[in-house]
C-alpha cells in the first residue's frame, strides 16, 4: 500500500517539540477539557474537462472553473484543509481529451495554493488506458502532486494508491492570557470506484486491471488508517448510488461522491451504525462543495497531548454549495472585488491561458480532407443548421436530390460504427452543432460538430425497439417540419425569424430527432406515424432489419437515457463505454478514404411509396371474364372502392330501382299471407 507524504506537513525543526506530544511550555492559560474545531474539505466531481470561469448574468448560471475555484478558495476565512475530487475529471471537453487529460492534471496540481490533494477515477477517466490514468500525477510540475486513489483496483503493470494521510496543525488561544495551545488532527483519505462501473469499460483499456468490491476495500483501508492514528476518515468514491453505497461502509466519517451528477447532501447510517455525511456537487464545474466536519479534541485537562482523543460528529457536519453566481458576487464586491479579480486574472493568465494557447494550436491540426460538403444547415457558416438537422435533413431536397439526407448525421453515425463495430448507430439533433465543408478538415472543425464531451456507448436492443424509436423520431421531425414551414412563410411575409419562432414554436423535444446509421432506409412521408419506414436493410450484410433480433447500437451517452421520448430504450442493455464522440469523428476523418468508408457504414435514406405485397408465387390463374353478347357493365360499389357508385347511367338506375321495388312487394305479400 503506497502512502503519500501529507501535503502542508510542517517540516521546520523549530516546531518539532510542539507537535510530537511534548508539553506546550509556552502555554500559561486555563486549558479547557475539550476544544471544538472542524475539518474543512472543498470538493468537486464530474467536471468532465470543464476548466475556466464563465458567468451569464441574465441566466444566473455558469462554470466555476479552476480560476473561479481559486477565488472561492481564497474567500474562506481559513483556507480549506483538503481539496478533493471524486472522478470523471480528465475526460470530456476537447480541452481535456486532446491532451489525454494532462491539461486538467496540470491545472489540478498548480492552479492555486497547493492544488488538489487527491482524486479517484471515474468511469470516463479510463478512456486513455489504465496505465496513463494511474500515472496521471506524472504530469505534475511540483514536488507534491495530487494523489490518484483507487483502493479496489489492481493492475499487473503497477500499484494503485489506496489512501493518503494529512496532518492538520491546530492552535487554541486563551482569550484572557492569549496563550496558545498547539495540537494536531490527522485525516485519512481513501478512494475507490464502484466495481460495477468497471464492467462497462473497454476491455483493451483496462487489460491487466481488475476491480474488487469497492466497499470492502474502503472498509479495510479505513480500518488501517484508524490504526495509524487518523482521527477523521474521508472517502472519495465514484459510485452508482452514493447513499446506498454509504450504508455498506465502516469507519468512514464522510463520503464525497461522484457519477450521479446531482447535488447531494444527506446523512446516512453506515454499516457500523455511525453517521456518514454523503455529499456530491453536481457536474461540469457548475458547483463546488465545502464540507465542514466538526470534532471535539479532548485535552484531558493537561498540556500533554500523549493521551488526548478526538471525537468526530459527522451528524452535525455542514455542507455548502458554491456556483459561478457566488464567484460573480465576490468579483463585484465593492470592498474586496478587486482583490478577487486579481486572483482570477492571475490564475487565468498564468495557468489557464498557456494551456488554452496550446489547445488552440492543436485545434488547427489538419486531420484529413473532404471532397464534398457535409453541412450543418445551408452552408459552411451553419445557417439554419439548428433547424435543418431537425427537419429538412430527413426529407428530399428541393432540387430532388435524395442522396444527401442527414449528411452530417451520417458522418457522425459512421464514425461511431467505425469505432465500435456496432450494427446500428444513432445521434440526436441536439448533440450536433457544426458541419464539414469541402477541403481540409481540422481538429477544430470536428470539435465544433460535437462540443459537449459526450461519450460513445454500445447498447443491445431489438430491431423492433430500434424501429419504434426511429418512427417516433420521424414523428417529432414531421411536427418540427410543419413549424419550420410556417416560420419560413411568416418570415417571407416580412417578419423576423425570432418573431416567426415565437409565433410557431418548436416542440420541446425537438433535439431528440435522431440521425441514424448502419441501415439503408426508405421513408414514406405520406404514411402515418409508426408506418413511415417502409424498408430497412443493414449495411453490414444487406439483410432486412429483423424486429425480433438483437442488435448492437452505438450512441452517445446522453440520448440513450431519454426513455421519455423513446420508451423502448428502457429495454436496452448497456455494454461498453468508448471514447468521446468528438474523438470518434477525429479518428474516422484521419483515415485515408474515410468518406467511402463512412458512406458504406452509414447507409442511405431514400424516399418513396409504401411497399406493396409482392405477387404470390406461383401466381394464381385469373378467372375468365364473363362473356356476353353485349358490352359487360362493371358495377362499382362502395364496398369495393370505399366510394359511392358513379351515377351516370340513368336507364340502369331506373331498372335497378324497379327490380328492387318488385322484390320488396313480393316479400311483404308473403309475410302478410303467413300472418293471416
Language-model-detected regions and their locations in the chain:
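A short C-terminal boundary segment appended to hydrolase-like catalytic domains
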Residues: 295-440, 589-612
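Acidic, metal/ion-coordinating pockets
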Residues: 29-323, 403, 408-411, 579-580
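Bacterial N-terminal signal peptides that target proteins for export
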Residues: 1-9
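Feature captures C-terminal
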Residues: 35-40, 50-54, 59-64, 144-152, ...
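Bacterial N-terminal signal peptides
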Residues: 11-21
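C-terminal low-complexity, Ser/Thr- and acidic/Pro-rich disordered "stalk" regions positioned immediately N-terminal
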Residues: 607-649
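Sec-dependent signal peptide cleavage junction
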Residues: 19-35, 642-652, 671-674
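C-terminal membrane-anchoring or membrane-association module
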Residues: 657-676
